[in-house]
Design a protein with these regions (language model features):
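A short beta-loop-alpha structural element at the N-terminal edge
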Residues: 16-32, 83-84
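Active-site rim helix/loop that mediates acceptor-substrate recognition in acyltransferases
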Residues: 44-71, 76, 80, 101-104, ...
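Conserved acyl-donor/pantetheine-binding loop and adjacent beta-alpha core of acyl/acetyltransferases
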Residues: 85-141, 205-212
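Conserved GNAT acetyl-CoA-binding A-motif
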Residues: 140-141, 169-182
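A short, internal acetyl-CoA/4′-phosphopantetheine-binding micro-motif in the GNAT/acyltransferase core
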Residues: 146-153
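Conserved acetyl-CoA-binding loop-helix of GNAT-fold acetyltransferases
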Residues: 154-167, 192
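Conserved active-site alpha-helix within GNAT-family acetyltransferase domains
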Residues: 159, 183-200
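Conserved catalytic-core motifs of GNAT/GCN5-like acyltransferases
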Residues: 178-180, 196-213
Length: 225
């Protein structure tokens, strides 16, 4: 889920940016950002909204850290990370239940689109597992999501959010952090922040049929440097 969307800077004027942990009241605003960036394949906007919300619920269920950028009272970006399995079981269950409920609504609204989305998710998980297996990195200490509203791109919000996630992993004793990204995302952003590409997967014809990106990457950051 760690992705950073490239978009043109639009000259947005802001008074100040507040950074704080995720609050459940941020959910709809963050899901809308994910919808704009990655969940807009269907002609049915309501389905796209549900799919983005499902993606966000999944990321929240698998993360132990959150940081949100708030501008003028509105959530405009988020970073999530996972270090171990220390998140409260109640919180994890809440987001897993939310994900299941959203999937049920997706199936009812657009069964074919939902089936294709689940095929994409399974293919992505398989690809990420292969990438990780090709490296000595542990499963934990991952930046699980980075998403910023395109309207505030260029203001440094993504950099602050990424630094917050990395600092959290370091504070939990991690010596290396990793994330997954792909050729559809701004992978150069991570290289500018010290991450190094350690593995690449090129999608085969079947994976491309499920809308997988041409190339998927594993990036690593040395936290001891």
């Amino acid at each position: 889920c760690a992705r950073y969307a490239s978009a043109k800077e639009r000259g947005t004027m802001v008074s100040r940016v507040l950074y704080r942990p995720f609050d459940t009241e941020d959910f709809d605003a963050i899901a809308l950002i994910l919808q704009q960036l990655w969940h807009n394949n269907s002609d049915n906007d309501e389905y796209n909204r549900l799919e983005a919300a499902c993606d966000l619920a999944y990321c929240l269920s698998s993360s132990t850290f959150s940081q949100v950028a708030v501008i003028d009272g509105q959530a405009r970006g988020i970073s999530l990370a996972r270090a171990g399995q220390s998140s409260g079981a109640t919180v994890k269950e809440h987001w897993m239940d939310t994900e299941r409920a959203l999937l049920s609504q997706m199936r009812e609204l657009e069964p074919d689109a939902c089936a294709e989305y689940l095929s994409f998710v399974r293919a992505t998980i398989r690809t990420n597992n292969r990438l990780l297996e090709s490296s000595p990195l542990p499963h934990d200490n991952e930046v699980t999501l980075l998403a910023v509203d395109p309207d505030v791109h260029g203001l440094g919000v993504g950099s602050v959010l990424l630094d917050a996630a990395v600092s959290y992993l370091s504070s939990r004793g991690a010596t290396r952090a990793h994330l997954y990204t792909d050729s559809n995302c701004s992978w150069k952003f991570y290289e500018l922040h010290g991450f190094k590409r350690t593995a690449t997967h090129r999608a085969n014809r079947e994976e491309r049929r499920h809308d997988m990106p041409r190339e998927s990457f594993l990036y690593e950051l040395d936290l001891t440097a």
